[in-house]
Amino acid sequence: MDSRFVTYFASAISASVLVTTIFVCWNVTHDLNTLQAMSDRNMQDFKAISDRTWDKMMFKQQSSPPSPSLIFGRNKRSGDKCNCSEEPSNCPGGPPGPPGEKGNDGVDGVDGIPGFPGENGGAALDQPADGTCIKCPPGPRGPPGPQGEEGPSGDVGEDGEPGVPGNDGADGTPGKSGAPGGKGPQGPPGTPGRPGQPGRKAIGEAGPKGPPGAPGTDGRRGENGTDGDDGVDGQPGDEGDAGKDGTPGEPGPQGEQGTEGQPGTDGAYCPCPARSISKVAIQ
Protein backbone atom coordinates (compact mmCIF):
# COMPACT_ATOMS: atom_id res chain seq x y z
CA MET A 1 0.00 0.00 0.00
CA ASP A 2 2.80 2.45 0.87
CA SER A 3 4.87 1.65 -2.23
CA ARG A 4 1.86 2.14 -4.49
CA PHE A 5 1.10 5.52 -2.91
CA VAL A 6 4.72 6.62 -3.35
CA THR A 7 4.61 5.54 -7.00
CA TYR A 8 1.41 7.52 -7.68
CA PHE A 9 2.77 10.55 -5.87
CA ALA A 10 6.05 10.51 -7.84
CA SER A 11 4.14 10.09 -11.12
CA ALA A 12 1.91 13.05 -10.30
CA ILE A 13 4.91 15.26 -9.49
CA SER A 14 6.67 14.23 -12.71
CA ALA A 15 3.58 14.97 -14.79
CA SER A 16 3.14 18.40 -13.18
CA VAL A 17 6.81 19.27 -13.78
CA LEU A 18 6.53 18.17 -17.42
CA VAL A 19 3.40 20.25 -17.99
CA THR A 20 5.02 23.28 -16.34
CA THR A 21 8.13 22.91 -18.53
CA ILE A 22 6.04 22.71 -21.71
CA PHE A 23 4.08 25.81 -20.70
CA VAL A 24 7.25 27.78 -19.92
CA CYS A 25 8.82 26.79 -23.27
CA TRP A 26 5.69 27.84 -25.14
CA ASN A 27 5.58 31.16 -23.28
CA VAL A 28 9.25 31.90 -24.08
CA THR A 29 8.71 31.03 -27.76
CA HIS A 30 5.66 33.29 -27.89
CA ASP A 31 7.62 36.18 -26.36
CA LEU A 32 10.47 35.70 -28.86
CA ASN A 33 8.06 35.70 -31.79
CA THR A 34 6.39 38.84 -30.48
CA LEU A 35 9.76 40.56 -30.06
CA GLN A 36 10.81 39.60 -33.59
CA ALA A 37 7.54 40.90 -35.03
CA MET A 38 7.97 44.20 -33.17
CA SER A 39 11.55 44.51 -34.44
CA ASP A 40 10.45 43.87 -38.04
CA ARG A 41 7.68 46.44 -37.73
CA ASN A 42 10.08 49.02 -36.28
CA MET A 43 12.56 48.37 -39.12
CA GLN A 44 9.81 48.82 -41.69
CA ASP A 45 8.72 52.08 -40.05
CA PHE A 46 12.33 53.31 -39.99
CA LYS A 47 12.82 52.39 -43.67
CA ALA A 48 9.60 54.20 -44.62
CA ILE A 49 10.67 57.32 -42.68
CA SER A 50 14.15 57.27 -44.27
CA ASP A 51 12.64 56.89 -47.76
CA ARG A 52 10.28 59.81 -47.20
CA THR A 53 13.14 61.93 -45.87
CA TRP A 54 15.29 61.12 -48.91
CA ASP A 55 12.43 61.99 -51.28
CA LYS A 56 11.95 65.32 -49.49
CA MET A 57 15.67 66.08 -49.79
CA MET A 58 15.62 65.34 -53.52
CA PHE A 59 12.48 67.43 -54.00
CA LYS A 60 13.99 70.36 -52.07
CA GLN A 61 17.16 70.16 -54.15
CA GLN A 62 15.21 70.19 -57.42
CA SER A 63 12.84 72.99 -56.39
CA SER A 64 15.40 75.15 -54.52
CA PRO A 65 15.79 78.74 -55.86
CA PRO A 66 18.99 79.74 -57.68
CA SER A 67 21.91 81.16 -55.77
CA PRO A 68 22.27 84.93 -55.27
CA SER A 69 25.08 85.04 -57.87
CA LEU A 70 22.67 83.83 -60.54
CA ILE A 71 20.07 86.42 -59.53
CA PHE A 72 22.28 89.48 -59.11
CA GLY A 73 25.09 88.51 -61.54
CA ARG A 74 25.64 89.96 -65.03
CA ASN A 75 25.98 86.80 -67.07
CA LYS A 76 26.02 87.40 -70.82
CA ARG A 77 23.79 85.33 -73.00
CA SER A 78 24.31 84.66 -76.66
CA GLY A 79 21.81 83.40 -79.20
CA ASP A 80 19.30 84.59 -81.71
CA LYS A 81 18.52 88.20 -81.00
CA CYS A 82 17.61 91.35 -82.73
CA ASN A 83 20.71 92.92 -84.39
CA CYS A 84 18.91 95.91 -85.73
CA SER A 85 19.77 98.15 -82.84
CA GLU A 86 20.79 98.23 -79.26
CA GLU A 87 19.12 95.39 -77.29
CA PRO A 88 16.27 96.80 -75.28
CA SER A 89 15.63 95.73 -71.75
CA ASN A 90 11.83 95.62 -71.91
CA CYS A 91 11.12 93.09 -74.67
CA PRO A 92 8.12 90.85 -74.06
CA GLY A 93 8.85 87.31 -72.98
CA GLY A 94 8.08 84.28 -75.06
CA PRO A 95 4.90 82.28 -74.74
CA PRO A 96 4.65 80.18 -71.58
CA GLY A 97 5.82 76.62 -71.81
CA PRO A 98 3.46 73.69 -71.64
CA PRO A 99 2.30 72.79 -68.15
CA GLY A 100 4.37 70.17 -66.44
CA GLU A 101 3.10 66.75 -65.52
CA LYS A 102 0.93 66.48 -62.47
CA GLY A 103 3.04 65.75 -59.45
CA ASN A 104 2.46 62.72 -57.28
CA ASP A 105 0.78 63.18 -53.94
CA GLY A 106 3.57 63.90 -51.52
CA VAL A 107 3.75 62.98 -47.88
CA ASP A 108 3.07 65.51 -45.18
CA GLY A 109 6.18 67.56 -44.62
CA VAL A 110 7.73 68.39 -41.27
CA ASP A 111 7.70 71.94 -39.96
CA GLY A 112 10.52 73.97 -41.47
CA ILE A 113 13.12 75.91 -39.49
CA PRO A 114 12.78 79.71 -39.28
CA GLY A 115 14.30 81.53 -42.28
CA PHE A 116 17.43 83.68 -42.17
CA PRO A 117 17.14 87.49 -42.11
CA GLY A 118 16.84 88.99 -45.61
CA GLU A 119 19.63 91.03 -47.20
CA ASN A 120 19.50 94.78 -47.48
CA GLY A 121 17.85 96.07 -50.65
CA GLY A 122 20.00 97.56 -53.40
CA ALA A 123 19.52 99.84 -56.34
CA ALA A 124 17.59 98.49 -59.30
CA LEU A 125 19.75 97.27 -62.18
CA ASP A 126 17.25 97.93 -64.95
CA GLN A 127 17.58 101.25 -66.74
CA PRO A 128 14.46 103.23 -67.37
CA ALA A 129 13.28 102.72 -70.93
CA ASP A 130 12.95 105.60 -73.28
CA GLY A 131 9.85 106.43 -75.18
CA THR A 132 10.79 104.46 -78.32
CA CYS A 133 10.27 100.70 -78.11
CA ILE A 134 11.79 98.33 -80.60
CA LYS A 135 9.56 95.33 -81.06
CA CYS A 136 11.56 92.16 -81.29
CA PRO A 137 10.28 88.81 -82.51
CA PRO A 138 9.15 86.49 -79.72
CA GLY A 139 11.72 84.10 -78.36
CA PRO A 140 11.68 80.36 -78.80
CA ARG A 141 9.20 78.21 -76.88
CA GLY A 142 10.42 77.61 -73.35
CA PRO A 143 11.16 74.18 -71.95
CA PRO A 144 8.52 72.36 -69.88
CA GLY A 145 8.23 73.69 -66.38
CA PRO A 146 9.40 71.69 -63.35
CA GLN A 147 7.10 69.27 -61.65
CA GLY A 148 4.44 71.11 -59.73
CA GLU A 149 4.26 71.01 -55.96
CA GLU A 150 1.71 68.96 -54.15
CA GLY A 151 -1.72 70.50 -54.53
CA PRO A 152 -3.91 71.35 -51.55
CA SER A 153 -6.35 68.81 -50.25
CA GLY A 154 -9.63 68.77 -52.14
CA ASP A 155 -12.93 69.70 -50.56
CA VAL A 156 -14.99 67.04 -48.94
CA GLY A 157 -17.29 65.49 -51.52
CA GLU A 158 -21.04 65.72 -51.27
CA ASP A 159 -23.00 62.96 -49.64
CA GLY A 160 -23.85 60.16 -52.00
CA GLU A 161 -27.38 59.21 -52.88
CA PRO A 162 -29.13 56.82 -50.53
CA GLY A 163 -28.46 53.21 -51.37
CA VAL A 164 -31.04 50.73 -52.49
CA PRO A 165 -32.94 49.26 -49.54
CA GLY A 166 -31.58 45.89 -48.57
CA ASN A 167 -33.53 42.67 -48.69
CA ASP A 168 -35.62 41.68 -45.75
CA GLY A 169 -33.64 39.81 -43.17
CA ALA A 170 -34.38 36.28 -42.15
CA ASP A 171 -36.95 35.69 -39.46
CA GLY A 172 -35.42 35.94 -36.03
CA THR A 173 -35.56 33.20 -33.50
CA PRO A 174 -38.63 33.25 -31.24
CA GLY A 175 -38.06 35.35 -28.15
CA LYS A 176 -38.42 34.14 -24.63
CA SER A 177 -41.86 33.98 -23.10
CA GLY A 178 -42.84 37.30 -21.58
CA ALA A 179 -43.87 37.81 -18.00
CA PRO A 180 -47.55 37.18 -17.15
CA GLY A 181 -49.66 40.22 -17.96
CA GLY A 182 -51.52 42.20 -15.34
CA LYS A 183 -55.10 41.53 -14.40
CA GLY A 184 -57.40 42.89 -17.08
CA PRO A 185 -60.52 44.99 -16.42
CA GLN A 186 -63.63 43.22 -15.23
CA GLY A 187 -65.77 42.11 -18.12
CA PRO A 188 -69.48 42.87 -18.46
CA PRO A 189 -71.96 40.59 -16.66
CA GLY A 190 -72.71 37.45 -18.60
CA THR A 191 -76.15 36.34 -19.68
CA PRO A 192 -78.05 34.31 -17.08
CA GLY A 193 -77.67 30.59 -17.53
CA ARG A 194 -80.52 28.19 -18.11
CA PRO A 195 -82.26 26.77 -15.03
CA GLY A 196 -80.53 23.66 -13.78
CA GLN A 197 -82.05 20.29 -13.05
CA PRO A 198 -83.93 19.96 -9.77
CA GLY A 199 -81.54 19.04 -7.02
CA ARG A 200 -81.82 15.93 -4.93
CA LYS A 201 -82.58 16.30 -1.26
CA ALA A 202 -79.56 15.28 0.73
CA ILE A 203 -78.52 15.66 4.31
CA GLY A 204 -75.01 17.01 4.52
CA GLU A 205 -72.56 16.62 7.33
CA ALA A 206 -72.47 19.18 10.08
CA GLY A 207 -70.27 22.12 9.19
CA PRO A 208 -67.51 23.51 11.37
CA LYS A 209 -68.33 25.44 14.53
CA GLY A 210 -69.30 28.99 13.76
CA PRO A 211 -67.74 32.08 15.35
CA PRO A 212 -69.01 33.28 18.77
CA GLY A 213 -72.22 35.29 18.67
CA ALA A 214 -72.69 38.85 19.88
CA PRO A 215 -73.05 39.41 23.69
CA GLY A 216 -76.63 39.19 25.02
CA THR A 217 -78.51 41.88 27.00
CA ASP A 218 -77.88 42.34 30.76
CA GLY A 219 -80.01 40.13 33.09
CA ARG A 220 -82.12 41.30 36.08
CA ARG A 221 -80.42 42.44 39.28
CA GLY A 222 -80.11 39.69 41.91
CA GLU A 223 -81.61 39.88 45.41
CA ASN A 224 -79.58 41.04 48.44
CA GLY A 225 -77.69 38.27 50.23
CA THR A 226 -78.05 37.33 53.95
CA ASP A 227 -75.81 38.83 56.65
CA GLY A 228 -72.58 36.96 57.22
CA ASP A 229 -71.44 35.36 60.52
CA ASP A 230 -69.34 37.31 63.06
CA GLY A 231 -65.67 37.11 62.44
CA VAL A 232 -63.13 35.49 64.78
CA ASP A 233 -61.68 37.76 67.56
CA GLY A 234 -58.39 39.23 66.62
CA GLN A 235 -55.17 38.72 68.56
CA PRO A 236 -54.33 41.25 71.36
CA GLY A 237 -52.37 44.21 70.19
CA ASP A 238 -48.94 45.35 71.43
CA GLU A 239 -48.55 46.95 74.88
CA GLY A 240 -49.30 50.63 74.79
CA ASP A 241 -46.98 53.41 75.99
CA ALA A 242 -47.03 54.57 79.65
CA GLY A 243 -49.68 57.17 80.41
CA LYS A 244 -48.96 60.66 81.70
CA ASP A 245 -48.69 61.33 85.50
CA GLY A 246 -52.03 61.95 87.18
CA THR A 247 -52.87 64.99 89.29
CA PRO A 248 -51.77 64.85 93.05
CA GLY A 249 -54.42 63.37 95.36
CA GLU A 250 -55.86 65.07 98.43
CA PRO A 251 -53.91 64.76 101.80
CA GLY A 252 -54.87 61.67 103.78
CA PRO A 253 -56.03 61.66 107.40
CA GLN A 254 -53.47 62.08 110.26
CA GLY A 255 -51.89 58.87 111.29
CA GLU A 256 -51.57 57.36 114.71
CA GLN A 257 -48.59 58.13 117.01
CA GLY A 258 -45.74 55.85 116.54
CA THR A 259 -43.84 53.81 119.11
CA GLU A 260 -40.88 55.18 121.02
CA GLY A 261 -37.66 55.00 119.23
CA GLN A 262 -34.37 53.41 120.31
CA PRO A 263 -31.76 55.50 122.19
CA GLY A 264 -29.45 57.43 119.94
CA THR A 265 -25.64 57.24 119.81
CA ASP A 266 -23.33 59.50 121.80
CA GLY A 267 -22.32 62.88 120.55
CA ALA A 268 -18.82 63.64 119.33
CA TYR A 269 -17.97 66.34 121.88
CA CYS A 270 -16.54 63.94 124.54
CA PRO A 271 -16.94 60.47 125.69
CA CYS A 272 -19.59 59.99 128.28
CA PRO A 273 -19.45 57.51 131.06
CA ALA A 274 -21.31 54.35 130.69
CA ARG A 275 -24.83 54.59 131.76
CA SER A 276 -26.34 52.18 134.13
CA ILE A 277 -29.64 50.61 133.68
CA SER A 278 -30.91 52.08 136.98
CA LYS A 279 -30.04 55.61 135.92
CA VAL A 280 -31.72 55.19 132.64
CA ALA A 281 -34.75 53.92 134.38
CA ILE A 282 -34.81 56.89 136.76
CA GLN A 283 -34.63 59.38 133.98
From Swiss-Prot:
Q: Which residues fall in a compositionally biased region of kind Acidic residues? A: 226-240
For this protein, the parts annotated as crossing the membrane are none
Q: Which GO terms describe its cellular component?
A: collagen trimer
UniProt keywords (A-Z) are: Collagen, Cuticle, Disulfide bond, Repeat
Establish whether keyword Disulfide bond is in the entry. Answer: yes
- Which Pfam family, an example, fits this chain? Col_cuticle_N
Q: Where is the composition biased (Low complexity)?
A: 253-265
Sorted alphabetically, which InterPro entries does this protein's record hold? Col_cuticle_N
Q: Which domain of life is it from?
A: Eukaryota
* Chain segments carrying region Disordered: 59-283
- Return the SMART domains for the record: Col_cuticle_N (SM01088)
Q: Which GO terms fall under molecular function for this chain's record?
A: structural constituent of cuticle
Residue numbers spanned by region Triple-helical region? 94-122, 139-201, 204-269
Extent of Pro residues compositional bias: 137-146
Family in the record: Belongs to the cuticular collagen family.
Record text on subunit structure and interactions:
Collagen polypeptide chains are complexed within the cuticle by disulfide bonds and other types of covalent cross-links.
What is this protein's function per UniProt? Nematode cuticles are composed largely of collagen-like proteins. The cuticle functions both as an exoskeleton and as a barrier to protect the worm from its environment.
Q: What protein am I looking at?
A: Putative cuticle collagen 79
Gene of this entry: col-79
